[in-house]
């Protein structure tokens, strides 16, 4: 048994994930029943990540702040600026792509269980109310805005505690981090189960009818990941951005693509930030915050599908209305994590700017759920990998 574990560790996590990915595709394609059964591995893996992430964020932030000493620099502000700027550029990119490659949708009738927010005020209100949630409830419901708020408050309070108390908090933080490493080590099995189940259940035919809209969506996300984000990093650091970009895509993006959950990928990003040698005082705050408000992929989804609906209905989109849509998408995307259904349920809000009827907007949402196996995966991979990318760029390790 020890020799097997040693061999498993020697191969490395990324090669094992690739092996799991290939095996998952083959099993899901050739033996669908086995693929569906293996889906339990993926469910358990995502469940374990989601279970450990809230307590990890709470303890890590609390420990980092309680042990912070005046004079130790933190780099949260520049990361937040990059989050917002990057999301706005993603929204503009989606608008440009929608004009270059106008897409018409074959609308479908479907029942959407979730209720979309009525207006932007409701989105922002939900986001602010998350700040004052009960701390135990926030951890139980993975409300990261609430978790961060309480962890910061308690962390400041613990600065007045004895050295022994702060040491205990630090030791507990180290213990939770070790648990996260053990969970992440099981990623190849989780990816195997997730991929096998997805291929077995959806196949490849279901997405063929939506190839054009998928190409626009994924093309925008690739453009942000491989062109726009590197330009932001180049301006910020003055260095070749691609080594860091590819590290983040490989170590964070691949896992996020298959888990389809920014929250579940928080432990993965925390582990990567630690491997990169970044300041814990910074990444313990910016990474969970990024999982909540850094939503470039969501902004792309909102704009592309909204403008596709406008093109389908023959609605003329002016430059001013497109710019307004980008601003609304940027702000709305920041609240996407607080809306059931995420970015897709914010489409009716954006569609209202063009007086698109709500029943049509909900049909567009239904299309979003159909293509979600690709759209949501790519969106999460972009969002989550960008969290650690921008955090690293703001760190002196990657400064000029």
From Swiss-Prot:
This chain is encoded by the gene named: sstT
Principal subcellular localization: membrane
Checking InterPro entries in the record gives: Na-dicarboxylate_symporter, Na:dicarbo_symporter_sf, Ser_Thr_transp_SstT
Family per record: Belongs to the dicarboxylate/amino acid:cation symporter (DAACS) (TC 2.A.23) family.
Q: What does this protein do?
A: Involved in the import of serine and threonine into the cell, with the concomitant import of sodium (symport system).
Q: Which reaction does it catalyse?
A: L-serine(in) + Na(+)(in) = L-serine(out) + Na(+)(out); L-threonine(in) + Na(+)(in) = L-threonine(out) + Na(+)(out)
Entry annotated with the keyword Transmembrane helix: yes
Which organism is this entry from? Psychrobacter cryohalolentis (strain ATCC BAA-1226 / DSM 17306 / VKM B-2378 / K5)
**What is the protein name stated in its UniProt record?**
Serine/threonine transporter SstT
Entry annotated with the keyword Endoplasmic reticulum: no
């Amino acid at each position: 048994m020890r020799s097997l574990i040693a061999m498993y560790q020697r191969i490395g996590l990324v090669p094992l994930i690739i092996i799991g990915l290939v095996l998952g595709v083959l099993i899901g394609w050739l033996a669908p029943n086995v693929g569906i059964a293996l889906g339990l591995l993926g469910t358990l893996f995502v469940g374990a990540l989601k279970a450990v992430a809230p307590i990890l964020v709470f303890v890590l932030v609390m420990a980092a702040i309680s042990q912070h000493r005046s004079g130790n620099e933190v780099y949260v502000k520049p990361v937040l600026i990059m989050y917002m700027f990057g999301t706005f550029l993603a929204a503009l990119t989606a608008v440009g792509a929608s004009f270059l490659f106008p897409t018409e949708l074959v609308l479908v009738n479907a029942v959407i269980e979730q209720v979309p927010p009525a207006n932007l005020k409701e989105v922002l209100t939900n986001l602010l109310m998350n700040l004052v949630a009960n701390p135990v409830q926030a951890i139980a419901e993975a409300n990261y805005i609430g978790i961060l708020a309480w962890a910061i408050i308690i962390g400041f309070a613990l600065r007045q505690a004895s050295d022994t108390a702060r040491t205990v908090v630090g030791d507990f933080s180290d213990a939770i981090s070790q648990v996260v490493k053990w969970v992440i080590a099981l990623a190849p099995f989780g990816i195997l189960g997730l991929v096998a189940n997805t291929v077995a259940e959806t196949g490849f035919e279901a997405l063929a009818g939506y190839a054009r809209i998928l190409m626009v969506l994924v093309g925008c996300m690739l453009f942000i990941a491989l062109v726009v984000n590197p330009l932001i990093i180049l301006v910020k650091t003055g260095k070749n951005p691609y080594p860091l970009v590819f590290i983040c895509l490989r170590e964070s993006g691949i896992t996020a693509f298959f888990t389809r959950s920014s929250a579940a990928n928080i432990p993965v990003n925390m582990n990567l930030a630690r491997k990169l040698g970044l300041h814990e005082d910074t990444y313990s705050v910016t990474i969970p915050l990024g999982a909540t408000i850094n939503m470039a992929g969501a902004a792309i989804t909102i704009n592309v599908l909204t403008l596709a609906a406008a093109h389908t209905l023959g609605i003329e989109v002016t430059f001013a209305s497109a710019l307004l849509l980008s601003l609304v998408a940027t702000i709305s995307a920041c609240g996407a994590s607080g809306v059931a259904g995420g970015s897709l349920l914010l489409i009716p809000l954006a569609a209202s700017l063009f007086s698109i009827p709500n029943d049509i907007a909900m049909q567009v949402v239904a299309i979003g759920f159909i293509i979600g196996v690709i759209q949501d995966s790519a969106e999460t991979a972009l969002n989550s990998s960008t969290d650690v990318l921008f955090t690293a760029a703001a760190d002196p390790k990657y400064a000029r």
